[in-house]
């Protein structure tokens, strides 16, 4: 008996569901990253992330007065440095950001 999709399909289904349920979030194209559409670039962004499979962390905390953006890696894997940089560049034009991103070995 199979209870879940393959992890690739499961992540894509999650992204599609988030986009439909939370129009205040903008997906970063090509990766599992979300930005608060109302983020004001005059402020230093707070960006958090970790591995997929712990939803709604971290995208569930993106919004006014909370996270500016989130980045999620593959299933039970932290996001890559390249993914973190991509989300940062899409979030702000400032040369600074505050990060809370978990780094751990793959499960």
Regions found by a protein language model. Name each.
Residues 54, 58-94:
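Glycine-rich oxoanion-binding loops at beta->alpha junctions
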Residues 6-13, 41, 53, 57, ...:
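Conserved active-site and cofactor/substrate-binding residues in soluble primary-metabolism enzymes
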Residues 1-46:
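N-terminal amphipathic/basic leader segments beginning at the initiator methionine
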Residues 31-34, 51-56:
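Short, functional N-terminal and low-complexity linear motifs
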Residues 32-34, 39, 61, 76, ...:
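Phenylalanine-focused residue identity feature
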Residues 44-51, 67-70, 96-105:
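Short glycine-rich or small-residue beta-strand-to-loop segments that form or flank ligand, phosphate
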Residues 14-26, 88, 92, 101, ...:
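Structural signal for hydrophobic packing residues in well-ordered secondary-structure cores
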Residues 14-17, 45-49, 63, 69-70, ...:
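Small-side-chain structural scaffolding
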């Amino acid at each position: 008996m199979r209870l879940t999709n393959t992890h690739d399909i499961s992540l894509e289904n999650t992204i599609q569901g988030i986009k439909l349920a939370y129009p205040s979030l903008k997906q970063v194209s090509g990766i599992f990253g979300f930005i608060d559409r109302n983020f004001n670039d005059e402020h230093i962004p707070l960006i958090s992330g970790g591995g997929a499979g712990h939803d709604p962390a971290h995208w569930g905390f993106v919004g006014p007065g909370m996270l500016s953006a989130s980045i999620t890696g593959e299933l039970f894997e932290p996001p890559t440095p390249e993914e973190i940089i991509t989300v940062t560049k899409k979030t702000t034009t400032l040369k600074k950001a505050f990060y809370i991103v978990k780094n751990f070995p793959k499960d």
